Amino acid sequence: MSNASFARPRALAVRSKSQSAALNQRATTTTRASSRRSVLARATPNDALRKSQAMEAIDACVTSSDLGFGEKYEGKVRDTYVDGDKMVAVTTDRQSAFDRHLAYIPFKGAVLNQTSQWWFKQTEHIVPNAVVATPDPNVTVMRRCEVFPIEFVVRGYLTGSTSTSLWTHYKNGGRNYCGNELNDGMVKNQKLPANIVTPTTKEKEHDRPISLADIVKEGWMKQEDLDYCVAKTLEVFAYAQEVAATRGLILVDTKYEFGRDADGTIRLIDEINTPDSSRYWLSDSYAERQAKGMEPDMIDKEFLRLWFAERCDPYKDEVLPEAPADLVAELSSRYVKLYEMITGETFEVPASSTDVNERMRNALKGVL
């Protein structure tokens, strides 16, 4: 990952009185679950329709961008354009996992970008963010920030499928992960006694897990900045878990990134609580499936990870099997479903005949 100085477009057990008040004030968007479900039932297309729309758009994915200004940095999913004190993040339909590209997923970029913007607005009472404007479904304009070289991964459950996942570490006998002590006798997908932060470094080749103590010891961050980011990570995550619960969802884990702007303010950057950066499970079936030793009903990219992991070694094999169209459409459908469950809004399918780059350039006029 690049360490350039810009924001890449990509458990608190008790709330304070002000936080509780803020949560109550957002009743129309974050509580009143029964009302939300009734609205959602009327507004959301069924799964078959979502999947059909995705199948029709497989050949019209946003695979790259060309906005024609500033310095361009191409990441795994986002293209970033830096110009002056602002940056533009274009979220594409590229799908990555295991540190490599896997497929293109219809509508993924728009879903991720719009999901992030919804969460940024919902959490700005907890921590400031870098968002300036969202002029296009795939585009966000952000303040330019100096990015802290640490990803703040936060977990509420013992799960995962990658080589660096908490579950992989645990099943291989590890009982300390990034400085967090883990109890014996736990099983996969079990809820942890409390949310934990398990940071990773942001490096060019491979990120690596690191303890909070080593972050300071190795000079990645100053203690004061680290303490602030850890506290905000736990606070935002706990709040988001409560919101997700009112939508029939379990927010399992996620990652947050922070940066410092020109005025010295530490801001939440990149993306927040998206199906790319997070795991979500359906809550109504979790207990029953867990009791039977079954995987939870997943509504994120984890099932795509599992598909590849069952058919190859995605870390070592030079050539990976091609994800079938039905699998790609299913993931797209799940992403859209998650967006609609979280926001209560119907996802608007972008017109496939539109020149995406022209659309984005026009949307940015008057914003930059």
Predicted regions mapped to residue ranges:
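A long amphipathic alpha-helix within ATP-dependent nucleotide-binding catalytic cores
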Residues: 221-252
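A short mid-domain helix/strand-loop element embedded in enzyme catalytic domains
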Residues: 191-223
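Catalytic activation segment of kinase domains across protein kinase-like and atypical kinase folds
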Residues: 256-302
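C-lobe/activation-segment region of protein kinase-like
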Residues: 288-331
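N-terminal mitochondrial targeting presequences
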Residues: 1, 33, 37-55
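A short glycine-rich, hydrophobically flanked beta-strand micro-motif that places a catalytic Asp/Glu
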Residues: 138, 244-261
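N-terminal chloroplast transit peptides
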Residues: 1-30
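Active-site loop/lid in soluble adenylation, ligation, and acyl-transfer enzymes
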Residues: 50, 54-203, 314-368
